[in-house]
């Protein structure tokens, strides 16, 4: 299984604005998880400065971002999708052992 990271840069006022959007964002995230395309996701930092969402498919990651109210309402200021070459761990896409 391939891995792709959806990387979000969050607006400085993210915490103040996310409340009104969080339910719709989480509904979208859990729908993607239930569909099997989203593995994990969450904010990074305390306070949050970015977010990472791990997907099994790059097209699904892009589609998620394009629909995400955090993106459409501007509390995500930049996003991109990058392949993640996972090599260690039980769910590594390409396990490499010494």
Residue locations for each model-derived region?
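Conserved, structured core segments of small domains
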Residues: 1-98
């Amino acid at each position: 299984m391939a891995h792709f990271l959806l990387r979000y840069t969050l607006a400085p006022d993210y915490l103040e604005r996310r409340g009104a959007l969080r339910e719709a964002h989480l509904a979208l995230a859990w729908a993607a998880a239930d569909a099997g395309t989203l593995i994990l996701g969450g904010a990074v930092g305390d306070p949050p400065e970015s977010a990472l969402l791990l997907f099994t498919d790059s097209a699904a990651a892009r589609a998620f971002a394009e629909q995400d109210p955090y993106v459409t309402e501007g509390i995500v200021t930049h996003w991109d999708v990058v392949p993640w070459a996972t090599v260690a761990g039980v769910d590594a896409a390409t396990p490499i052992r010494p």
